[in-house]
Design a protein with these regions (language model features):
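Catalytic-core segments of class I nucleotidyltransferases/pyrophosphorylases
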Residues: 110-114, 145-213, 217-232
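Conserved donor-nucleotide/metal-binding helix-loop-beta segment in metal-dependent transferases, i.e.
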Residues: 104-133
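Conserved N-terminal catalytic core of the sugar/cofactor nucleotidyltransferase
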Residues: 13-14, 18-96, 108
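N-terminal nucleotide-binding beta1-loop-alpha1 segment
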Residues: 1-6, 12, 201
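Short acidic-glycine loop/turn motifs at beta-strand connectors
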Residues: 139-145
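Residue-level signal for inorganic ion chemistry
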Residues: 21, 83, 99, 138, ...
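A short, conserved beta-strand element in the Rossmann-like catalytic core
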Residues: 100-103, 211
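Conserved beta-strand termini and adjacent loop/short-helix elements that scaffold enzyme active sites
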Residues: 40, 63-66, 123, 152, ...
Length: 232
């Protein structure tokens, strides 16, 4: 999204006069189940997030992972581990990428996870094989249980694409360190989920709506034109 994001974080870009991150958090707030929001930023964008957080009414912590560039970044999985270690987190986590929007409520995933009593992700049908090769792909059984998952597969085994929205049980959060030690892959959070699904049951909820991935200028302009908000 350069030059828009050269000196400005993508999650704070505006869609219909509201930052992407505000769309996500204001929706999640409706379930009244989240005790604290934690935003992990590199050092370069830290002050932007601090300014954004200044007038928020909910409990919010901004974490600086100490990195400056793409070349030195920790990767999403190590960022999550860094936050859990720094804040000594010992609770269930809802993990979301700040550059995606949904037209349905994320509280549906929370409710689904409470019903399944496992860590859970979401899935949607993707017919484009080339897009599947750039995403996390999860094959499931009749009960939505993940039976195979791979991040950016060369040969996708099914058409279920998994966007970066995850509900992790606290006991599974404790396995992140082990996953990193066993080289689960640390750039995309889906790499950890793929590893985790081979250790414990993980379910993948069929999405009841659409996801908008804001990856470049074209997709950003498209979202600004088409996004209608979250249907309840």
């Amino acid at each position: 999204l350069y030059p828009l994001t050269e000196n400005f974080p993508k999650p704070l870009l505006k869609v219909r006069e509201k930052a992407i991150l505000d769309w996500l958090i204001e929706d999640i707030e409706t379930c009244k189940l989240i005790e604290e929001y934690i935003v992990i930023s590199n050092h370069k964008y830290l002050n932007h997030f601090k300014e954004w957080a200044r007038d928020k009414k909910y409990k919010l912590t901004i974490i600086d992972d100490g990195t400056y560039t793409n070349d030195t970044r920790l990767g999403a999985v190590k960022d999550i581990q860094y936050a859990t270690d720094s804040l000594r987190l010992s609770d269930d986590l809802l993990i979301i990428a700040g550059d995606n929007l949904l037209d349905f409520s994320l509280t549906r995933l929370i409710e689904y996870a409470k019903e399944k009593k496992t860590s859970c992700i979401m899935r949607f049908y993707q017919s484009d094989i080339e897009k599947l090769k750039k995403a996390g792909v999860a094959c499931v059984d009749a009960d939505d249980l993940i039976i195979d998952m791979e991040e950016k597969p060369k040969n996708p085994k099914c058409n279920w694409c998994t966007p970066p929205f995850y509900f992790l049980l606290k006991e599974d959060v404790k396995l992140i360190k082990k996953g990193i030690e066993e080289r689960c892959g640390t750039d995309a959070p889906g790499s950890f989920i793929a590893w985790l699904s081979k250790q414990v049951p993980v379910h993948a909820m069929l999405m009841p709506g659409n996801r908008y991935d804001i990856g470049d200028i074209i997709s950003y302009e498209e979202v600004k034109r088409e996004y209608k908000g979250i249907a309840r």
